[in-house]
């Protein structure tokens, strides 16, 4: 097991930034709300907005499992007839080395980029590329994890009428979202990853 993974167990116990309950944006800021209130708020807003397939965008983090990526893709397709689901597909390198173990180490530290590619999600190289693909008039943005966490993208997302974030940790996305639903850490899942 690599040092980066082996030594992150301490992060699993940090409770201050953990999202444990659904959060809803109110005039006073974010408040804990019940699951029922979270789902009702999302449903009411979607019924009010009546988004078309081109007005719904999804962003996923490649720390999500294959099962989560598949279900998120299915939600967008079956629920909104949208195939606008993007993941960070950044450039990475694999060093050439005479020492075998070094040839196994790449600059790609994402655990499931290959899984996202195999599920035929749309890769984006940068947040600027994502910004260019979000059309004017987008009504719903669904974000799984914290992909493309960039000030310009977060600022543009603030203009979208409904932003939903599913994440285990607080981030710029949870602060931008109208509703944030708690996600799970890798240690809390029985899931698969394709690296």
Residue ranges and their predicted role:
Residues 1-189, 194:
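Catalytic alpha/large subunits of respiratory electron-transfer oxidoreductases
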């Amino acid at each position: 097991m690599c040092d980066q993974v082996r030594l992150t167990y301490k992060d699993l116990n940090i409770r201050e930034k953990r999202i444990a309950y659904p959060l809803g944006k109110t005039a006073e800021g974010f408040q804990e709300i019940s699951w029922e209130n979270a789902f009702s708020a999302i449903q009411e807003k979607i019924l009010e907005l009546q988004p078309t397939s081109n007005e719904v965008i999804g962003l996923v983090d490649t720390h999500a499992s294959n099962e989560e990526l598949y279900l998120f893709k299915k939600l967008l397709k079956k629920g909104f007839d949208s195939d606008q689901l993007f993941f960070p597909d950044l450039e990475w390198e694999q060093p050439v080395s005479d020492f075998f173990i070094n040839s196994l180490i790449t600059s790609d530290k994402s655990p499931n980029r290959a899984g996202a590619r195999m599920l035929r999600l749309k890769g984006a190289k940068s947040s600027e590329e994502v910004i260019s693909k979000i059309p004017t008039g987008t009504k719903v943005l669904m974000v799984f994890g914290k992909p493309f966490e960039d000030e310009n993208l977060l600022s543009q997302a603030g203009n979208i009428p409904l932003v939903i974030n599913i994440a285990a940790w607080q981030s710029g996305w949870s602060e931008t979202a109208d509703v944030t639903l708690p996600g799970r850490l890798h240690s809390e899942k029985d899931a698969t990853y394709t690296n």
